[in-house]
Amino acid sequence: MTSSDLYAGLKELEEQIADYNRAKDVDRARAHALEHTIADLLVQTGIADEMGFRAMHEDGTPFEEVVAAAHTAVTRIADTRIPDGMHIFGEVPEGERRVEFIHAIMRYNGEVRDAVLRMTGHDASTADDALLRDAEAAAKSLIAAILEGEPPDRAAERVLGDRLRRLDLEALQKIQDGVLDLAARIDDSDEIGSLLSGCAGGYIPPGPSGLITRGKPEVLPTGRNFYSLDPFRIPTRAAWRIGTRLAESVIQKYIEEHRAIPENIGMYWMASDVMWADGEQLAQVFSLIGVEPVWTDGRVRSYRVVPLEELGRPRIDVTIRMSGILRDCFYSCIELLDDAIREVAGLDEPPEMNFIRKHALEGSGTARIFGSRPGTYGNGVSLAVYASAWKEEADLAEVFLRWNSYAYGRDNFGEESPETFSAQLATVDLTFNKTVTDEYDLLGCCCYFGAHGGLTGAVRALSNRDVPAYYGDTRDRDRVEVRTLAEEIRRVVRAKLLNPKWIEGMKRHGYKGAGDISRQVGTVYGWEATTQEVDDRIFDDITRTFVLDAEMRQFFADENPWALEEIGRRLLEAHERGLWDADPDVLEGLRAAYLEMEGWIEDRMGDAGGDVQGGAVRVVTVGDVKALRGAREKE
């Protein structure tokens, strides 16, 4: 993982914002001139659309507030970490990549950054974004110096220079020990040796798994027979603290935007919540419904129902679409949650203070955890989207219902419950998922848009309401946030997908890198197909970056022309379906480029040395099948 770095207009925008903040109180004439520059850059970078700049301007919003909103948007991108290419099996990071890797590991608990802040006379709890980013840069330089063998005290003096107020020798020694320990663990990795040993029937030593960038250095060295965790320790106490903050944050955001408390929150619950985040989302659900775990020796033995007077708000109902891996690996977590939901549903409380009971009394029952049929995986929606097997959003909603209406709990394992599932979805006020790391994001797999996007589309279709979609962020345990799905898509697209630094990393991997770029563009299309939360500007910029840029087009032509054809085809489909209101010049260029791509493909097919049999494929939707069956029954 590496820092995303700002690029092109985003970097200039950040610099102009910093200049404005310095000038606004001491040089009003310069500040006024910078206002025009900043406004132009906001439009140029697309940040203006994200923050509603036009509406702010029309409403007479003070420019200082405009700048604050712009700073938040830019910082969200700058603080994102991105993969530096892909991992090659058997290789360990060296040089600058090792520095980046170790910094990414130590960044989670903040010990190096916080030591830098203390030694420069600052406090992490009161530091602003710019100061925190400067401290992280210094932390990375300090790690690099230690890896090169420089004593930590001299390294700190050199890196911090005249900013240094006092050396913290104890902290520096601890940092050195941590850096050298991680370096030794990296060097001890033996992925190829373990693979060969396993193939020969040899013993492979066991080791823990998890997200190394969330403070789990014990995952190293790699090449071990990794195991997961004890599910009866989920959620941990640390995850409970984060989960309760998530619950209150999502409620507060909905209240701010809709002037009402949400009655029912639809959620996508993945196994990664258990394996990577120690059950933060499970803790969030507990907090929403008003129960808390009871631990004994670190294991969750039961739960306590929090009285309403202590809770201070109504109990929020939940409708959960869980992943197949969660179902098959961590069923004890499902049973624990199901027990809590059913007990809360049976409490003798006013329905207006217990929305689970309210909806149960209205006929939805008490099943709240749903997934695909036992023994199967997937959500159905991503398959329909990739096959273009849909005509309108209602088709995708029906696919989602058919695939995911199986209820799970203590006393039922995959009981088909379409009526209950539909009744619950119709009362959902918002949908929710969250990110826990920059190693994996909402463009990384079709399951994200298929499940969360499919859930959102189904809720909107059944409720006939424009239900919002939210995304939580617990990448930094000290800065838990909840934003809209549209904001999260913008963050990931700008920080990663359109970032020249990420693109160059992918290009190092040739055919595979080109294929992964295409796959992530396809995921952007999937989000738009299911939720319509992707800005037109994003599709414009994707087209400019990957299709219209001559250098990128040549890369695809040399390495993987089929990947670019897929990108072009999805973009054209987005336009034809009315999902993308394209810039006319961009659309014209796309169409011309796609004709060129078809020529590439035909040339490559000719190299096969034989005839190629084409064919016609007719894709039908569920509705078409019903109509055909009805017509035959009438015959």
Q: Each predicted region: which residue ranges?
A:
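Ligand/cofactor-recognition surfaces for anionic moieties
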Residues: M1-E635
